[in-house]
Amino acid sequence: MSKEEVLLNEEIDFKEVRCVSDNGEVYGIISSKEALNLAHKAGLDLVLISPNAKPPVCKIMDYGKFRYQAEKKQKEARKKQKQIEIKEIKLSTQIAQNDINYKVKHAIEFLESGKHVKFKVFLKQRELNIPDAGMDTLGKVAVMLEDIAIAEKEPKLEGKHLNVLYVPKKKEKH
């Protein structure tokens, strides 16, 4: 919550406001000057909580503490968000089958730990016109991963790379 979003003390310029104290005591509908005087007497700030209400609602509180609590809540919410990690595995069109097996084995480990895996097939200049070789390589990978993961989209040509992103399949609850 930024300072620009909240009106404080002298910035509140309404004729009448509904005033509430920090501990929940209701002062009722009073003039904004009177509410400001009450806040100054208590050594606190007058904070506009709900400007769209009729009349607007103000609260007498310690604004610094209010901001600290709001920032703390936002920080906790960010901590609880799940970060999706994407692992990238590079392949070429000339890759041998045992190398594909090795890389897919690692991809399976990543997928089982909940990570997303992006396979990137590098196409050489002569292969850019006919990206079938890259599609064949990704096709081999798709067959090996069909039980564990699903491709989020069809393979897509981006510059000199053919990309496909795999996400773990949802585990069925019994």
Swiss-Prot record:
Keywords from the named record: Cytoplasm, Initiation factor, Protein biosynthesis
Put simply, this protein is called Translation initiation factor IF-3
Question: Where, subcellularly, is it found?
Answer: Cytoplasm
What gene name is listed for this protein?
Answer: infC
State any single GO MF term: ribosome binding
- Describe the protein's quaternary organization and the partners it interacts with: Monomer.
Cross-referenced InterPro entries, in alphabetical order? Answer: T_IF-3_C_sf, T_IF-3_N_sf, Translation_initiation_fac3_CS, Translation_initiation_fac_3, Translation_initiation_fac_3_C, Translation_initiation_fac_3_N
Q: What is the lineage of its organism?
A: Bacteria, Pseudomonadati, Campylobacterota, Epsilonproteobacteria, Campylobacterales
Name a GO CC annotation attached to this entry: cytosol
What this chain does, per the entry, is described as:
IF-3 binds to the 30S ribosomal subunit and shifts the equilibrium between 70S ribosomes and their 50S and 30S subunits in favor of the free subunits, thus enhancing the availability of 30S subunits on which protein synthesis initiation begins.
Question: Can you tell me which family this protein belongs to?
Answer: Belongs to the IF-3 family.
- Output the Gene3D superfamilies linked to this UniProt entry: Translation initiation factor 3 (IF-3), C-terminal domain, Translation initiation factor 3 (IF-3), N-terminal domain
List, alphabetically, the NCBIfam families matched.
infC (TIGR00168)
Q: Name one GO biological process term.
A: ribosome disassembly
